Amino acid sequence: MAGCARRRAACPLTRIIASCVGGPSGICAGQAWECESEIDIVRYQRAKTGALFAACTMAGAASSGYEPLGWQKLGFAIGEAFQVADDLRDVAGSAEKLGKPVHQDEANQRPNFVAELGFDGAMGHFEDLLAEAMAAIPPCPGQEQLGQQITGVSRSLVSGLSSRTAAA
């Protein structure tokens, strides 16, 4: 009987993850868009990184007894913010600090926010997304601490980056 109960509890989580990462609006679609000549960068990143983060926030909410859809906007906002930070780090970070090669978006002709908005525009978009994420945290125990944690981790991703280092 315990096995059946665990399987029933896992079904909503499986549906959440599948809806966020599969099909025409999930990560598979986002990956396929890389082959297109023109891409809506927000839709593209929402389908990729945003979908992964939304799956995490929604699955976590469902596992904790909260309505998953109430956490979707938060996931999309922090996912897109993470992607913008990654794009900024790709042009202004160092391979030594990041532990991975830099300038890969340009070399592989991948859509990215820095190419679309410029360095300063991408940094402004990052700040807007962080504010959007803070506003999207549903009421819950630990809401303030969650906001502080998201802000701290997010800001650490872009700490020390500037348009001067991007131009170097």
Segments predicted by a language model, with ranges:
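All-alpha prenyltransferase/terpene-synthase fold signal
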Residues: 1-168
